[in-house]
Amino acid sequence: MNELRFSRRTLLAGIPLSAAAAPRTVMVRAKRKPSDPSWTEYPTRTVESLDGFKPRQTAADRYGGRLDRKARATGFFYPIERDRRWWLVDPEGHLFIKAGVCSTSPGRSKNNKEALARKFGTVERWAAETVKLLRSHAFNGTGGWSDVASLRQAPARLPYTVSMNFLSTFGRELKLTFQQPGHTGYRGDAIPVFHSAFPAFCETYAAKMVDAPRDPFLLGYFSDNELPAPRDWLDKHLNLDPSDEATLPSRRAAENWLSARKGAKAGLADVNDEDRDAFRGFVYERYLTLTTGALRKADPNHLCLGPRLHGSALRSPAVFRAAGKYLDVIAVNIYGQWSPAADMLEMWRAEAKRPFLVTEFYAKGHDSGFPNTTGAGWLVPTQKDRALFYQNFVLGCLESKLCVGWHWFKYMDNDPEDLTTDPSNRDSNKGMVRIDYTPYQDLLDGMKELNANLYALTDWMDRG
């Protein structure tokens, strides 16, 4: 790890920097894929490298909101833009940015269960000790797929989210779905939002799944995970099998949309890239109006966070226009970016005009002894390098002034012996604890260095 100095342009590839930002970095070796033949060095900013920044902890309330910045209290979380920076406001009315962890749950494998019994004895004790672990490293929340039921009963609580599965559940009923690495796949990439039964399903599903509409610690809901939005989605819809009754509503919706846009005789040969992106927005608008409408009817108090946009959807202006229209905060899973890309963030700002919450990002450590062949996160040599990646990525998020939080993926490593998991979670060092619940202390120490200075860093970035 070597310390170097770079110009502001080199540092963030065009991300606008505040006057306070420092042009100092360290170099961290990484691979985007474990199969890459060699390591590449990436300029990496850390808390320690920020010229002029002085670490300072800020007093916080029980939710993690800063006591020195106040807004209107509603008893629940909500977003607010103040002085050109987006924040969450916690139930007591204090400005809040969420530092959370995905999949904060006991492991389900035989090895995990035996380790939990040895270390904690009971799931209740695990929940209490895990909240202590997170809080002691300045995390103030949990993310998707966490053990909500157990963590709700812990003596001390953390803000949390709830993961729902509107489309994957409905699609499964239609026999349209299959497992892909990391998320549900749909036949022909056609999500069945145009099916005549989907609106009623959304209403019933939301009413059934909402179980804590008055809980102030609940931040909000993810409606699904990583829905498809390929650039050629319109082409795929127009080519769907007309004899397939489950996907026929999607094909007809695409045909009708194209006819309304370009004339009754328009076909695939008349489609251009502007049409393709507009169609993505059309599909997402249909999905979002139904799911957010059903959620807000069942629970008007908590935030709609959306389906955790990922992949090519992150570059779609039309998808982000639709997301900004219907979501309170836009959940995004970001992979393949050492820092959040400047042009992408500016597009989100222009099109959505809403804040974002990073709901997955991570790096795996080569020193863990895992093969690390599964999952989309970066590969770095050591646990200390994982912490440096965390600091660099989060600093880029904070500097955007659009980010109201992040969820590291994830709490626990994959157990290579557990073959019941989804194929993207088989053999990799994604956790902050090992499969026997032993913490990766070098990683956690580096995370704490940033988390503990979270509000001081935003103040430093916003000055001048």
Feature map (PLM): residue ranges:
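Aromatic- and acidic-residue-enriched segments that line the glycan-binding/catalytic groove
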Residues: 154-181, 223-264, 418-430
